[in-house]
Amino acid sequence: MGAELKDSEGAGVVASRRGAAMASRYISRLARVSSHLSPNPLMASEKEAALAAAPPSDSPTIFDKIINKEIPSTVVFEDDKVLAFRDISPQAPTHILIIPKVKDGLSGLSKAEERHFEILGRLLYTAKLVAKQEGLEDGFRIVINDGPSGCQSVYHLHIHLLGGRQMNWPPG
């Protein structure tokens, strides 16, 4: 017996149970990736994208493709250790992602070890430099989402730098 799935346009597709499960996983992964590539992701919220995200691992992520220039991005800062680029689905007038160029086991902040001390400091200092470069003298916010409950959707440590408007509290 088949199951009906809906594609991104809402059309029904009949599939076997196994095929339906595989298609559902594929759609979830596609939605997670598209949330960082498209201003109109398949999933409506970051929470849904985070819950659908693959568990943390050392497998390549969308950020690895950006680091390797396989996917275009608008880079605002780069050195030998860190890359900063504009988020393609900004949540503020200025929304920049700051990432280590080498993941080194840092799929999220909760995975940090003492050996990551230097890169963690470098990421925060880079956030300060980029904020100044972007003219955020009045203030800015940095955010690190960690794990599914923290709405992390890409398992490569990254800092969101948000600014250009009055932020609200509490944030989430």
Each language-model region and where it sits:
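HIT superfamily nucleotide-processing domains
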Residues: 2-172
